[in-house]
């Protein structure tokens, strides 16, 4: 404990790190304030229907990513989701389209071009999602809530246009906040904003669970203690999954330049057990919603009922299988053995016992296939843990922290942020946050 307190003191002794932490904290406060600012012309006291409809499914995921702003009809309702969607599209284009693949290999200049394209695509997605969100609002809340239409005499058309523009500006502002945090704050800004939205729900979830368990006289307190112990074990498992890597040794050839010798050292390529992050869970959740679109048809009503039973066997069985499939797919998209082999060859590196070129590509591909299997199974288990928690009587809000997207994002972003703080401490010759002085994070969401 004494060492931990000393480390916290050291963090604030470093002026640059202190400024970055304060800057990040202030921008996060701005974001959280905006999440509670309701769109002008809407009565905030009449949003119960919208909040209820955004509590589960993929829409619940969007509401979680926006920190509750989606269900509050906030000016930040769209949050960072348009930017994330655009980033995923550009990332996929980098695999399937030669032009984007070329940009990926151009280094910093190519990255800047792709970032600019991501911003423009974000605007296009916002232009689609903004009107769709306004249409959803009209369906979910009573007409009396639209004060601008009922009392100020605005037409629905102009109200929707103005509200869509405000949503666009809000989403772009959130994206700007994320970029500023990344550049001048601590951690990855976009990921940190999502994590803050998730963390904001935790106090409500834990208080609700405490209230339910302590109100029962048949061992409620004991059950609560068991739940918390199990939750800590699950968090530890999630940390292990995020940090787990398979290290592939790489030997670099010796080069003599003048009187100095370069290279000849052995390094490692860390291949992550879960290289896909949380994306397989998000894709699987989106796909599981498709049967609900046909719920009004008699022939498919039974299938829709099965797919809407989040604690049912078939829902979780299919959901888990989809997570495994999408883990393999997204890993194949994001991890490119061919590019890794070319980079190694270009820098004079090789894997001991493996010929450079095609054999290296095949070797890396085989390793990724082997390590992805346990990673995908572990990810599938974590993704269905919230449903299992609900079956055992845990409150829905608290159960969402037992696994799935919430837990993995929370763990991943915290590790990334701690890794940055760790690097600042070690550069100034202070003790790190961990005894080993090393912390592994994740590269992206």
What do the PLM-derived regions correspond to, one by one?
Residues 1-104, 109-445:
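N-terminal cationic and glycine-rich segments that engage phosphates or anionic surfaces
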